[in-house]
């Protein structure tokens, strides 16, 4: 009976680690990106809505963890009268799937948060500089600087590209966890 409890615990530990680590990564990414958004919003409030992408991408990581944790906990079978119905292979597979998804989402949350914070700040700063330069030129002053009006847009596209690749880390863990949990479960003999 003790082996049965240990095996079931490894499955539930996989589900718990998946949801905890994934939401930790989502919270980390939201926190860091939110700092950048608040900082940028002071000087360039017009860019707040389009720069919500980093926060939304960080929140998706928590959803990945929730989905995998539900699948894992649904695959855990209860023991029946001293008979083990949950194999050791399945227990460790559930543990591996939970850790894979959770740790990948934790890493993706950190990458999304850091890239999001600095990308948002840089985009807002560049847009503010372009706006100030346009106002200066409209007042009749000739600027000696030759600037490109598309700098802020190019910087934003680059930032979103970096965020997409950092979010892909979490997606890879999510897909691998789904593959691991969908593998054939061995029945106990």
Predicted regions: what they are:
Residues 1-189:
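Hydrophobic, small-residue-rich transmembrane alpha-helices and their short perimembrane loops
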């Amino acid at each position: 009976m003790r082996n049965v409890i240990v095996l079931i615990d490894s499955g539930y530990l996989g589900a718990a680690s998946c949801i905890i680590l994934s939401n930790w990564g989502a919270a980390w990414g939201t926190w860091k990106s939110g700092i950048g958004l608040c900082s940028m919003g002071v000087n360039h409030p017009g860019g707040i809505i389009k720069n919500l992408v980093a926060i939304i991408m960080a929140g998706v990581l928590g959803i990945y963890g929730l989905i995998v944790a539900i699948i894992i906990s649904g695959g855990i079978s209860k023991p029946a009268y001293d008979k083990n119905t949950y194999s050791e292979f399945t227990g460790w597979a559930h543990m591996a799937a939970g850790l894979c998804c959770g740790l990948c989402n934790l890493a993706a949350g950190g990458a999304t948060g850091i890239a999001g914070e600095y990308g948002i700040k840089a985009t807002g700063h560049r847009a503010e500089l372009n706006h100030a330069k346009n106002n200066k030129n409209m007042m009749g002053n000739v600027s000696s600087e030759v600037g490109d009006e598309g700098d802020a847009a190019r910087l934003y596209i680059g930032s979103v590209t970096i965020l997409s690749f950092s979010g892909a880390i979490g997606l890879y863990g999510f897909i691998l966890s789904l593959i691991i949990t969908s593998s054939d479960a061995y029945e106990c003999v």
